[in-house]
């Protein structure tokens, strides 16, 4: 005879155990990124993190710019003389680019410049 309350309790315990394991493996990582003349230094153009890490990008720039993290759909306006934070939990795995928004097309879509940073999220 199957006991659904016992099965439900076992599934809940397993789910909570999995969530705690994921939380224990997750890290908080911070990267200070400076945009100068429309570029990030070569040694900061590739960032590697693990799935479920909390990633904080601290942006500074020499000219006003809007940046967009593709795949997570996060956009920030960055102004000279300030640090602008872009924080997210790396839930999706894969390669995600951060690109500047340069303007709008006649149809209203925004245009992107060259990739500033690539973020690789590993399982």
Regions found by a protein language model. Name each.
Residues 21-27:
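Bacterial Sec-dependent signal peptides at the C-terminal "C-region" and cleavage site
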Residues 27-54:
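N-terminal edge beta-strand
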Residues 37-46, 69-72, 81-85:
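N-terminal post-signal-peptidase region of extra-cytosolic proteins
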Residues 10-21:
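Bacterial N-terminal signal peptides
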Residues 66-69, 97-99:
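Beta-strand acidic-aromatic groove motif in beta-rich domains, primarily in extracellular
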Residues 27, 31-33, 78-123:
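Extracellular/periplasmic metallocenter environments
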Residues 45-63, 83-92, 96:
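Beta-strand cores of secreted/periplasmic/IMS beta-sandwich domains, seen most often
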Residues 2-11:
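Bacterial N-terminal signal peptides that target proteins for export
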